[in-house]
């Protein structure tokens, strides 16, 4: 497709209409590169994608994609073994999260049958392990403390040191208030300093870092905090080094998956682009045109996309029809009609919806040529006629039977008689070459050419003689007429002058009467068609209303189901939590034996309200619908026996699943858990406690990992963990506390010594963690 036609018809302005609907930089790049296609299968595929997106919006009105930055350059840097910065990693994290969201969204789609988009959704891949690691990068582009134990240690020390410095300086603010120009702690070169009056600079021992512009204030770092500030400086350097190490580790994690991540990013961008095309179609009442197998064109109520209030027109360019000649005076909208045809064809061949009604049809041309407007070249000293003729010669040399040619005011700019003859000769050459052509002209001679020549049709633009203004309605099959006599009469020209003028052109009066009759017949036909279209629109509105009511009912039903499940779970959780509290108090007060606690707990658990939903037909139907989809890695689940939430991490060869439930890794069969709906992820989650799956003696021991925890948090988790282990009759458990500063390890030891249900405990063997882990025997 030649690029000049894109400039002449302002195709880039059409693309700008799509831009506001795009959310991702990838889709913006795809839009900027969009050009008309010349292969029907590719165009058909683009149209099928829009149809698929329409189905999605019928089921999910608010379907959308989060804003995503382009990651193409970041992925190239990874391939070159470079490390990414925090913002680049955050952009990739968003792509991974969005990919996972799209996969879950697709898996939950009901009542949708795709033609093209299914392959995109199915080619998306998710990375649960990578997503888990990247939780250490928050949405603000900051590394969280838990990114590594070392980073947490450094930041904890940094916080403590900064607190001590502030405390010392706060005390000095009170003690030395009379020596200070301001009662505040300032900062100079990253060091905490005090603003001291210059006259008292020798009263405070320390390091001078700055002097105010007036010289009245000296910024001194008191000697009491110099060492601490040095420590803070070193800790900040350590923090930067550890952050760089973590970013390097994250970059290494991503490197093996660059190709897949790039493909995911492209798919997300393309889905966003298809979504934008659908929204453009919906907002502008556009349509997906059919693609003709020949050169047939049929545009129903087609509109110019760049005009604010365009008039809709019908245009039919049948296979046998070679040329349409629009005749009549200027200012009637002939050029607009010419451009409307060209833009509709460019949009359709670019895979964009066309501003027309359903049933419209486009052809597929290898090239579209146009000579529109005054393109004379001052530099080449060419007249208007010479400029047009130079361009026309170029078009005639390049056009073939797979081309569409558009001429505006063909033959203008020279002697009318010669110009009309040239116009007819050019049209005849194109007709004999079987090249589809639309041309506008004000030469009356071309009316006769259109009537007398096979496969050529006249057309005109309607003119309202009452208001003396054009209506911009296209009348195919009706030649144009000047309406000069009617206009002159209505403007007050003497009747005898008008009569004399008519007598001078008597030879044309019969033709004008015929044209007038054709116009009347065309208007009557159009009125009837408009009435039929109104009835069709009423039917469409009714169908949409019914479909909307059905979707609203389905949505409300789903909300009620979720509410019922949530309320039932809250009742059970509340009862179990109360029982835990009661047993803990009994244990603290009465020295109950472990088996007595377990028996009592089991009895109280039986008292938890049981919500019998087995006879609820709506819930049973919902369960069947949910069960229709098999679980996948990354799915959120609820363990049926404990009511705890977790995530599926892998599937074993025997069909069982491994799941991470809090701090515990569990092996489950499919009937031991239920999938959590994606929508439930947005709900406020009930408070959960860590649980231990009951294991037989031959299975792996339960393990609690306290590394990276605060002391109070670690002790609380340890207490809950031992309690759950006793409840599940576990004989031995592992406690991983690390070595670190030894605070957590010492706390674990103290707790185990005073717990009467701990039979024995000792550090793990050297090859199993050594002094960083403790093996506990319960009894």
UniProtKB/Swiss-Prot annotation:
Positions that bind ATP: 328-335
GO annotation, biological process: mismatch repair; negative regulation of DNA recombination; rescue of stalled ribosome
Entries under Pfam families matching the protein: MSSS, MutS_V, Smr
Keywords: ATP-binding, DNA-binding, Endonuclease, Hydrolase, Nuclease, Nucleotide-binding, RNA-binding, rRNA-binding
EC annotation from Swiss-Prot or TrEMBL: 3.1.-.-, 3.6.4.-
GO-annotated molecular function: ATP binding; ATP hydrolysis activity; ATP-dependent DNA damage sensor activity; endonuclease activity; mismatched DNA binding; ribosomal large subunit binding; rRNA binding
Top class in the EC scheme: hydrolase
Record Gene3D superfamilies: 1.10.1420.10, 3.30.1370.110, P-loop containing nucleotide triphosphate hydrolases (3.40.50.300)
Protein origin, superkingdom: Bacteria
Ranges where the Smr domain occurs: 704-779
Record note on quaternary structure: Homodimer. Binds to stalled ribosomes, contacting rRNA.
Family per similarity comment: Belongs to the DNA mismatch repair MutS family. MutS2 subfamily.
Function, in words: Endonuclease that is involved in the suppression of homologous recombination and thus may have a key role in the control of bacterial genetic diversity. Acts as a ribosome collision sensor, splitting the ribosome into its 2 subunits. Detects stalled/collided 70S ribosomes which it binds and splits by an ATP-hydrolysis driven conformational change. Acts upstream of the ribosome quality control system (RQC), a ribosome-associated complex that mediates the extraction of incompletely synthesized nascent chains from stalled ribosomes and their subsequent degradation. Probably generates substrates for RQC.
Name by which UniProt lists this protein: Endonuclease MutS2
Organism: Streptococcus agalactiae serotype V (strain ATCC BAA-611 / 2603 V/R)
Lineage, broadest ranks: Bacteria, Bacillati, Bacillota, Bacilli, Lactobacillales
